[in-house]
Amino acid sequence: MKRGMLVAALVVLASPLALLSAGGKGAVSGEYVEARTAEVFTGGCIMGSEAETVGKNAVLAWKVNQGSFNGVSLDGLTVVAAVAGDRNLGIGEIGGAKAATRSAVFVDSRANAAQQLALVAMATELSKGLVGNIVEVTPSAIEFADRGKEIHVAAGQVALDVSKEMSHDPTCGAMQWFHPLATVDQAAIGVAQQNAFSGSGLGAKWSDPNRRSAFFGTFAY
């Protein structure tokens, strides 16, 4: 019962009004990885056929190395968001209307209530509002492991494995079409060997492996 009340409180407190009134942001830095259900590096012929129909879903993950947000220390904590949109999440970059989104957020189960709220606020801010209309906030045991050549993330119903090595296939004039969905430094394109969400709260589930659909890098805010 207590856990259910905490989760409900976090969803309410994660509203834009509550996040805006939370005070100064502080300084925070760490590692970031994302993958969407569309290739970010592909040929024009493929993009032309997929732009309106794919890329509606994504997983975004932040691992804080050190720092605070809204005055709350987040050292060593992690937050993961699964996002479902009504259209390609990056379509605005190529002239389309911005997607309306719903988000399920997984906050580090080691965090206290104030830290969990700060993690949600940080994800909302660094994703430039993409992590919005939050329908679920779930405390979870989260794995975020940089294994050298790949990054592994697991949280609740989210599974993400990103290879840092990507071949630049010249087929069909391949090029980069999109940028990261969140604020990130030194962003590099990766291959999502696994990109899956199996939860029920977003009205969408996905599994979209083996695609050049990922970005990884660091963040500082």
Each predicted region: which residue ranges?
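Mature, soluble, non-transmembrane domains
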Residues: 102, 106-218
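Bacterial N-terminal signal peptides
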Residues: 7-18
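N-terminal Sec/ER secretory leader and immediately downstream segment
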Residues: 23-104
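A sequence-level detector of short, solvent-exposed, charge-rich linear segments
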Residues: 16, 20, 57, 64, ...
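Positively charged n-region of N-terminal signal peptides that target proteins for export
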Residues: 1-4
